[in-house]
């Protein structure tokens, strides 16, 4: 632990000196956190979770993601990398991006499903990205949620480098609304309320404690298959087409 504390201070000192030599410009500092106790806890808003439950929509953990015991709507995702801007004038660190590579979620309705994998946080745009998978394929680094930074980055070097921040009011981007509506086969009423839904909060906490057994390899989530009834419908359409060709 003393080694981690010393290393963290040396790293910050080195970048501070670099920033000083570069004047007021910020220097990007990328920190791999796969082997640190770095977690992002995603909690669905209670009202949105209740509505999703009534609509028959459920959420399941994939890859590194773990469901919090006793809850169907809270998930922990290991943070694998963060990038900060270090500046000397004024002295400080500001978040640039963060990644939870290897983590994923499956969102499933009674008639369809989609997957979200390899989450990223873009603090320049305040957007959460993920590889979005549907029966049509996978869209890499898709803009899923817009968010508000409720509690800005808090950094401490006491006992080692630690960071914490809180994101709230996560709402679907316009592109994600269209993908959710199509993939989950939502009815018109459900589609109309998508823009108004708060999908919850994300709490990020990083401490200098070591951890093992976390993979930072990209998660390749299985592409959700069309629902059984939709597949049956396509099969019947195919049989009808063949029968018509034979009659002609």
Where are the predicted features?
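Short, charged juxtamembrane terminal tails flanking transmembrane helices
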Residues: 245-248
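Sec-dependent N-terminal signal peptides
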Residues: 11-16, 234
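Bacterial N-terminal signal peptides that target proteins for export
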Residues: 2-12
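N-terminal signal peptide c-region/cleavage motif recognized by signal peptidases
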Residues: 21-23
């Amino acid at each position: 632990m003393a080694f981690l504390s010393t290393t963290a201070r040396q790293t910050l000192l080195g970048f501070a000196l670099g920033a000083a030599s570069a004047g007021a410009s910020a220097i990007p500092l990328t920190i791999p956190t796969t082997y640190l106790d770095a977690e992002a806890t995603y909690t669905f808003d209670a009202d949105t979770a209740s509505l999703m439950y009534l609509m028959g929509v459920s959420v399941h953990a994939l890859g590194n993601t773990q469901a919090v015991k006793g809850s169907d709507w809270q998930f922990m995702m290991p943070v694998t990398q963060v990038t900060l801007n270090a500046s000397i004038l004024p002295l400080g660190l500001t978040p640039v991006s963060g990644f939870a590579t290897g983590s994923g979620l499956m969102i499933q309705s009674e008639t369809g499903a989609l997957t979200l994998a390899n989450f990223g946080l873009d603090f320049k745009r305040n957007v959460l990205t993920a590889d979005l998978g549907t029966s049509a394929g996978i869209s890499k680094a898709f803009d899923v949620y817009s968010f508000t930074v409720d509690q800005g980055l808090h950094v401490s070097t006491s006992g080692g480098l630690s960071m914490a921040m809180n994101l709230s009011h996560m709402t679907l981007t316009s592109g994600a609304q269209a993908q959710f509506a199509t993939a989950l086969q939502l009815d018109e009423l459900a589609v109309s309320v998508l823009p108004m839904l708060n999908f919850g909060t994300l709490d990020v906490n990083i401490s200098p404690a070591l951890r093992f057994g976390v993979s930072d390899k990209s998660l390749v989530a299985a592409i959700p298959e069309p629902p059984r009834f939709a597949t049956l419908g396509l099969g019947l359409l195919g049989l009808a087409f063949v029968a018509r060709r034979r009659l002609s």
